[in-house]
Amino acid sequence: MSTLLQHAQIDWDDQGRPHSRQYDDVYFAVNEGIEETKHVFLGQTRLAERFANLAPHTCGVIGETGFGTGMNFFCAWQLFDQHAHRDARLHFVSVEKYPLGHADMARAVSLWPELAAYTEPLLEQYVAVHPGFQQFTFANGRVTLTLLIGDVLEQLPQLDAQIDVWFLDGFAPAKNPDMWTPELFAQLARLSHPGTVLGTFTTTGWVRRSLVEAGFAMKKVPGIGKKWEVMSGAYVGPVPGPKAPWYARPAVAQGPREALVIGAGLAGSTTAASLARRGWQVTVLERHEAPAQEASGNPQGVLYLKLSAHGTALSQMILSGFGYTRRQLQRLQRGQDWDACGVLQLAFDAKEAERQGKLAAAFDHDLLHALERAEAEAIAGVALPAGGLFYPEGGWVHPPALCQQQLQHPGIRLLTHQDVIELRNIGQHWQAWAGDRLLASAPVVVLAGAADVRRFEPCAQLPLKRIRGQITRLPATASSRALRTVVCAEGYVAPPRGDEHTLGASFDFHSEDLAPTVAEHQGNLALLDEISVDLAQRLGVAELDAEQLQGRAAFRCTSPDYLPIVGPLADSQAFAEAYAVLGRDARQVPDVACPWLGGLYVNSGHGSRGLITAPLSGELVAAWVCGEPLPLPRAVAEACHPNRFALRRLIRGK
């Protein structure tokens, strides 16, 4: 899967319309673009009627091939506003190989001032759009946009969704034949269900025949303007079953839309927000006196993307999660709660320099690029021992501010000093107990308490481990304020938040003591020397008494494969019995439904990447719970699934 982003190459004609150089075609007809969209995509699919018939708390899903300028999305959103119940939701999924850059997108949408209520929210969030799945949330969660950035035959096969309406809007088949292939139409069929409808401009004969072969009943209908005819259709083919029952979707929860989230750190607060935005009443149980008291409580965390040039599952998740987090941060106060000051990873030795060279070749310049030492120093504002890799969209975040912001939704109730010791399943409800005291109950529970989720029997076998880390808080000086970007080597140092820099962080695999130690403060100061002797001097490190330094220690929680553990939980004993045959033949796929623990989910194991992976994982949990399109490629969601460890034990006999 390609990791390089190619933006649309746009020329503008004398009437202000964008013209694609890649496809030598216009994005929409002059003076008729919106009317064409309304006729072909909204009218032929009877979208207004569909929206009006959406029941409260249900979600209509539109799939599109070719996002382009977003016109179809904006028009569909406007129609949804006009006709849908206020508690219904819209999820729009669109594939785009060559996304417009921000400036081109702003110029294109300025042609439709009547759609400003819909175009402006997108422009505000149109940041960090990189290859893979990129999710946007609008209208307090009522509308979700998932852009699949890349080649359609790389992206759509990874989509896990059930589409109600298709907009086929790639450039004309003669200009863009890759968007009109039997392989693509097979993917449309895979993602459709009886009742799925389709609209498209093209009436090309071989396109119609290929769609019919894929399972769509197609017909020509009157067109608009210079387009005499267009096509519409409906899916009448078979519905494929899931291939791997252990990763199949559990039944969508019925009954009251109430959930418990245990833990109010990044994983818990973002999961609660994702559910609340979907109309759930969420109770968050936190054992401390306030949210973000453990690993999510550091004064500054770094938005650092540890990527792979090989497109691994972790790398794909980081790229998608980074974009989602950056869009969430737009709602916080810049400078106090976060700052997009960039992150500079120093090439501190030959091995690191080689790794960075591969990354610079694999990813686009807007995401990361190599800097020589002089260039790096000019950006950082302090002298450095080497150049490195610069991530211009990175920066630092005050994690407690993000947690607090996520928990402010009116559908969330936070209860502190609630230490859940035991879960009990009673009928269709889960009960949270502290000794002989019932704290709360709900049909859905999400365990988001880092490694402490293992105190609950359904998570007891999850291989989570705790790694102690300590940060050091250094008082800023007049000269240390010259630091303008986060700089990383083996450790990291951030520009000041208020009057303090954050320096860290140690790794201790053995200690269970969370009292900050002088030795680790000294270790962090040594890391600072490796980052910048100049900055250490500006901070007066030589005169600092390590015994008087302030800091903070917490446990990171990580898994053996460094991917988080996110998704529905199964009964471990019943799982082992149901799929015991895998121990003899791993190629077997038993026709046995997974023994889910109905309504029970986990979101844990984010390690030092929680700022990037936890918010999108909250969306992943909510998608599992509500039966919505997953916000990550299916293979990535499976790589994060809690069942992966039980499968490995069965197959490897461990």
From Swiss-Prot:
Species whose genome carries this gene: Pseudomonas putida (strain GB-1)
Keyword annotations: Cytoplasm, FAD, Flavoprotein, Methyltransferase, Multifunctional enzyme, Oxidoreductase, S-adenosyl-L-methionine, Transferase, tRNA processing
Localization per Swiss-Prot or TrEMBL: Cytoplasm
Signal peptide: none
Homology family: In the N-terminal section; belongs to the methyltransferase superfamily. tRNA (mnm(5)s(2)U34)-methyltransferase family.
PANTHER family linked: SARCOSINE DEHYDROGENASE-RELATED, TRNA 5-METHYLAMINOMETHYL-2-THIOURIDINE BIOSYNTHESIS BIFUNCTIONAL PROTEIN MNMC
GO biological process, one term: methylation
Region of interest (tRNA (mnm(5)s(2)U34)-methyltransferase), residue spans: 1-236
Designated name of the protein: tRNA 5-methylaminomethyl-2-thiouridine biosynthesis bifunctional protein MnmC
Organism lineage: Bacteria, Pseudomonadati, Pseudomonadota, Gammaproteobacteria, Pseudomonadales
Residues annotated as transmembrane: none
E.C. numbers: 2.1.1.61, 1.5.-.-
Purpose: Catalyzes the last two steps in the biosynthesis of 5-methylaminomethyl-2-thiouridine (mnm(5)s(2)U) at the wobble position (U34) in tRNA. Catalyzes the FAD-dependent demodification of cmnm(5)s(2)U34 to nm(5)s(2)U34, followed by the transfer of a methyl group from S-adenosyl-L-methionine to nm(5)s(2)U34, to form mnm(5)s(2)U34.
GO MF entries: flavin adenine dinucleotide binding; oxidoreductase activity, acting on the CH-NH group of donors; tRNA (5-methylaminomethyl-2-thiouridylate)(34)-methyltransferase activity
SUPFAM superfamilies: FAD/NAD(P)-binding domain (SSF51905), S-adenosyl-L-methionine-dependent methyltransferases (SSF53335)
